[in-house]
A protein has these predicted regions:
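Intrinsically disordered, low-complexity terminal regions
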Residues: 1-146
Length: 146
């Protein structure tokens, strides 16, 4: 049901889901679909993402997400952080790659603890062929290059 997941190396793909716990993928060459209901996600992509599907989908309901990719990885970013007014933690997007980052000016939704603001990041590198979709609530998204 819940608990941490750690994968040291995967060649083709990883699909990982936990109800609560950290997900760490030390090396992946193919596609990734990783979801946690509460915890951080850390993924390092190796290779160039040119052979087949190398899309990346990462989602956490409450945690930081860090993705490290090669500097010439061809990708399109679609990033979103939902910050809730009731939370003391407010997430940001930090990226080694250029992208457009937009933060909503006003709180959305009904008054009270359910009010939220989104921070989104969009951009591409090279052909943009690999789709990078990352979403978290009240956490940071960090994109690094190696």
């Amino acid at each position: 049901m819940g608990g941490a997941i750690r994968i040291k190396r995967a060649k083709q793909f990883v699909k990982a889901k936990t109800m609560g716990g950290k997900i760490t993928i030390d090396e992946i060459e193919g596609w990734v679909d990783a979801t946690t209901m509460g915890g951080d996600i850390k993924v390092e992509v190796v290779g160039k993402g040119q052979n087949g599907n190398a899309d990346i989908k990462l989602s956490s309901m409450n945690g930081d997400i860090t993705l490290t990719v090669p500097k010439k990885y061809e990708m399109t970013f679609d990033l979103e952080i939902v910050n809730y007014k009731s939370s003391s933690e407010k997430g940001n997007i930090i990226s080694d790659f250029e992208m457009d980052i937009l933060e909503e000016d006003a709180w959305q939704g009904d008054s009270g603890n359910d009010q939220r603001k989104s921070v989104t990041g969009k951009g591409s590198v090279g052909s943009g062929k690999n789709k990078i979709s990352i979403k978290t609530h009240n956490g940071n998204i960090v994109i690094k290059k190696h």
